[in-house]
């Protein structure tokens, strides 16, 4: 009988310890309060820092507590152009400047935003990776919703009270820089999760993978596998509608969809 394969080991149920002990903390907006709903709060960026395991830099923003004599420190995903000492304004009456946080209803159509909330007060969900941004498409004042174009190209309708940061997330173009050597990839994934190096199935022994074994590296059977295949067999092209290169009409249709 074969062994438990890699795809089964990384599934739910096994012991997993997240690599979070060296991270700076969760990056999110301030907790939504009376000050942000009705006016604005002023904060200052004390430092821009690197968070291990995250592509985008983080900005540590210090706010004065609205009621008590103390300061509040928050970690924001840094927008392109943020700098140490910059004042950041959060709230309904904040100005349209890069780094400021406003509700979507206060942001004009066509504006570039990032770290957009999905529900009012969830402190930021969409467009948070390095170089990402979302575009405000339209507002619907009748039902209080806003249509937003996400980095994937999908268009999503969210409540107009959801907050967003003006600008694009810093660190764009990070993935275009070549890794150059295995050591760089080692350090990159060491702070993320155990997913590197990734050995191909055809390079394994037959006991370790359905694609393993043989006198030369080949799968030996169809690489497509049915949707209801059991774990351990479900590797390769799962429930593929088609395989191979796009040719003829299919290629033209795909090219037209990419342009749109």
Swiss-Prot record:
GO terms under cellular component: cytosolic large ribosomal subunit
Localization terms from the record: Cytoplasm
Secretion signal span: none
One Pfam assignment: Ribosomal_L2_C
Single GO MF descriptor: RNA binding
Keywords assigned: Cytoplasm, Ribonucleoprotein, Ribosomal protein
Region Disordered, residue ranges: 1-24
Metal-binding in keyword set: no
Single Gene Ontology BP annotation: cytoplasmic translation
Family: Belongs to the universal ribosomal protein uL2 family.
Name of this protein: Large ribosomal subunit protein uL2
Source organism per UniProt: Solanum lycopersicum (Tomato)
Gene behind the chain: RPL8
């Amino acid at each position: 009988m074969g062994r438990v394969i890699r795809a089964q080991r990384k599934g739910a149920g096994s012991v997993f310890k997240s690599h979070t002990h060296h991270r700076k903390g969760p990056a999110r907006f301030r907790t939504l309060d009376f000050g942000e709903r009705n006016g604005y709060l002023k904060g200052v960026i004390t430092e821009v820092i690197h968070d291990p395991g995250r592509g985008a830099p983080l900005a540590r923003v210090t706010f004065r507590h609205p009621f008590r004599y103390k300061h509040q420190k928050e970690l924001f995903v840094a927008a392109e152009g943020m700098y140490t000492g910059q004042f950041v304004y959060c709230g309904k009456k904040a100005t349209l400047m890069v780094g400021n946080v406003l509700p979507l209803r206060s942001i004009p159509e066509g504006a570039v935003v990032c770290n957009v909330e999905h529900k009012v007060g969830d402190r930021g969900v969409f467009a948070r990776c390095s170089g990402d941004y979302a575009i405000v498409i339209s507002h619907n004042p009748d039902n209080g919703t806003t249509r937003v174009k996400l980095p994937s190209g999908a268009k999503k309708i969210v409540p107009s009270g959801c907050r967003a940061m003006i600008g694009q997330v810093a660190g764009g173009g990070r993935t275009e820089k070549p890794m150059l050597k295995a050591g760089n990839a080692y350090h990159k994934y060491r702070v993320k999760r155990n997913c590197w190096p990734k050995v191909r199935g055809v390079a394994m022994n037959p006991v370790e993978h359905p694609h393993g074994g043989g006198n030369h590296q080949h799968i030996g059977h169809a690489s497509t596998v049915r949707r209801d295949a059991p774990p351990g067999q479900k590797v390769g092209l799962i429930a593929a509608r088609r395989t191979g290169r796009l040719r003829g009409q299919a290629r033209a249709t795909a090219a037209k969809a990419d342009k749109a």
